[in-house]
């Protein structure tokens, strides 16, 4: 889903329908108005923040994922600090960040100068991910003691590997459940209590009926 003109109908349906996962992937890319304009994004910082407010209000248990881009041509230190504060304020449940690189045939590659040094780009990626690691760990620790509906994807060694409704396969975190007497089946759902948390993984135990 993209931020510009995000439909209210989607928010209403997600809030009301229990069969829909409370998970959205919205690629904000940046939050500085100067960078958004340079990227030809069709929304402003104010519009992005208002969309997030509407989503959080309507769907309190929403897991919000985003992707960010640092080092785009013209990104200043002030632009980056604004982006860092955005991550700190919004506290995304899931987040990825990439360093800009020229892609042949694109507007930015043909019309803009790649003026942010590679070392600076990588430092900015690392700073955002260090902050996100802290946020993710804090978010996960708050889930300890909760019971989550989990789908089992696989067994790896001494653990069953599953996901909650807040996790997309292969890109998000997993919940690891120790192998015990009860056999868990791939593709089946179970109620699992979260027993401990790491920055990008949960650990749990399946509740017995």
What kind of region is each of these model predictions?
Residues 1-80, 88:
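Conserved SAM/AdoMet-binding glycine-rich loop
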Residues 8-13, 83-84, 136, 148, ...:
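A generic local structural motif
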């Amino acid at each position: 889903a993209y931020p510009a003109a995000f439909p209210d109908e989607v928010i209403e349906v997600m809030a009301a329908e229990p069969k829909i996962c409370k998970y959205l992937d919205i690629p904000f890319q940046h939050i500085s108005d100067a960078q958004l304009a340079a990227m030809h994004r069709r929304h402003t910082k104010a519009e992005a923040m208002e969309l997030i407010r509407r989503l959080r209000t309507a769907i309190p248990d929403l897991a919000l994922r985003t992707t960010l881009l640092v080092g785009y041509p013209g990104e200043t230190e002030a632009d980056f600090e604004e982006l860092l504060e955005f991550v700190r304020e919004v506290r995304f449940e899931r987040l990825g960040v990439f360093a800009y690189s020229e892609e042949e045939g694109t507007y930015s590659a043909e019309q803009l100068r790649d003026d942010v040094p590679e070392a600076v780009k990588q430092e900015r990626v690392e700073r955002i991910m260090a902050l996100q690691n802290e946020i993710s760990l804090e978010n996960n620790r708050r889930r300890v003691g909760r019971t989550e509906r989990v789908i089992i994807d696989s067994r790896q060694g001494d653990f069953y590997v599953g996901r909650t409704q807040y996790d997309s396969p292969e890109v998000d975190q997993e919940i690891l459940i120790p192998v015990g007497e009860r056999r868990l089946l791939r593709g089946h759902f179970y109620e699992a209590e979260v027993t401990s948390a790491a920055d990008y993984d949960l650990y749990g135990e399946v509740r017995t009926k």
